[in-house]
């Protein structure tokens, strides 16, 4: 169950990044296609809702499209630096 929650949260972060950059799902998928991805809009939608996992190649393409650090995808999912004793 914990993994599902993280998938949903990653999906929320992906949606936030997409909206922040002003893309519809359709326009984002077109950009992904230009980078060699075969992802459909419905597949991307499932990734945003946490019902499907993202392929590493698509993840890397999104990083390049958005021009962000990997940590942007994991906001709220990674433990704080000083939480371990």
What are these regions (language model features)?
Residues 2-4, 19-20, 64, 71-85:
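Short, charged recognition helix plus adjacent turn
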């Amino acid at each position: 169950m914990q993994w599902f929650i993280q998938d949903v949260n990653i999906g929320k972060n992906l949606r936030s990044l997409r909206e922040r950059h002003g893309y519809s799902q359709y326009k984002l998928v077109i950009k992904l296609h230009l980078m060699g991805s075969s992802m459909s809009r419905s597949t991307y939608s499932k990734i945003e809702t946490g019902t499907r996992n993202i392929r590493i190649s698509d993840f890397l393409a999104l990083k390049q499209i958005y021009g962000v650090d990997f940590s942007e995808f994991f906001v709220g999912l990674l433990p704080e630096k000083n939480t371990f004793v």
